[in-house]
């Protein structure tokens, strides 16, 4: 695979790629040595220098883990992508991710989403403008049924989905807009669909 590298150097390069792919950052010199059976850090440094001279990596000598993969055939630097469903409508009594609700998908790096179940909604209206959420924005929502006071949520009320700040009061739920010209909504019958964790906007 790498005709100008020895087997040991190939093992080192493949290990670096795997660690970057799995963890998002390169291994230390000691970790490389442990992985390929080299006790001497100076020997590892020697192999890294050869790999760098061959054009497969770039190092920053002032930092302990600064190894950048330059090999164009490597997928170590490629972020995996997930396609998040964009929900066109929210129907009472129906699962939010029901196929008929999904109008499109939006690509995001997997490390943004992690292992959460997420969806996106397009915001309609100006009730959350002071929170930086504008009419037409796409919001990224982590699906969950509970929320803490002050969190921005997507909630179902009167068979409609709304984006507001959540506050649990003595006997009622208050859904607070972030717009001084709009009044809060008070209700006992509120279903939390998820917490807003991101906002995406196209600037024209």
Curated annotation (Swiss-Prot):
Entry keyword set: Autocatalytic cleavage, DNA damage, DNA repair, DNA replication, DNA-binding, Hydrolase, Repressor, SOS response, Transcription, Transcription regulation
Q: Which CDD domains match?
A: S24_LexA-like
Instruction: Please give the DNA-binding region boundaries.
Output: 29-49
Q: Which GO terms describe its molecular function?
A: DNA binding; serine-type endopeptidase activity
Cite the EC number: 3.4.21.88
- Residues of the active site: 127, 164
- What is the main EC category here? hydrolase
- Subunit structure of this entry? Homodimer.
In the record, the note on similarity to other proteins reads: Belongs to the peptidase S24 family.
Described by its record, this protein's role is as follows:
Represses a number of genes involved in the response to DNA damage (SOS response), including recA and lexA. In the presence of single-stranded DNA, RecA interacts with LexA causing an autocatalytic cleavage which disrupts the DNA-binding part of LexA, leading to derepression of the SOS regulon and eventually DNA repair.
Protein name per UniProt: LexA repressor
The gene that this protein is the product of is: lexA
């Amino acid at each position: 695979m790498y005709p100008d590298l020895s087997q040991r150097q190939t093992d080192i390069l493949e290990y670096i790629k795997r660690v970057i792919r799995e963890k998002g950052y390169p291994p230390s010199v000691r970790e490389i040595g442990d992985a390929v059976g080299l006790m001497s850090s100076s020997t590892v440094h020697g192999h890294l220098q050869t790999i760098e001279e061959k054009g497969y990596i770039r190092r920053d000598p002032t930092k302990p883990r600064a190894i950048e993969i330059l090999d164009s055939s490597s997928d170590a630097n490629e972020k995996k992508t997930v396609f998040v469903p964009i929900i066109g409508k929210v129907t009472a009594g129906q699962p939010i991710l029901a196929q008929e609700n999904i109008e499109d998908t939006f690509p995001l790096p997997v490390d943004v989403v992690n292992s959460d179940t997420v969806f996106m909604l397009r915001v309609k209206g100006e009730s959350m403008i002071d929170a930086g959420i504008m009419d037409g924005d796409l919001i990224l929502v982590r699906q969950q049924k509970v929320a803490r006071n002050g969190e921005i949520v997507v909630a179902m009320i009167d068979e409609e989905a709304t984006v507001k700040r959540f506050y649990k009061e003595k006997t009622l739920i208050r859904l607070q807009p972030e717009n001084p010209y709009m009044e809060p909504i008070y209700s006992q019958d509120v279903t939390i669909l998820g917490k807003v964790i991101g906002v995406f906007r196209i600037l024209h």
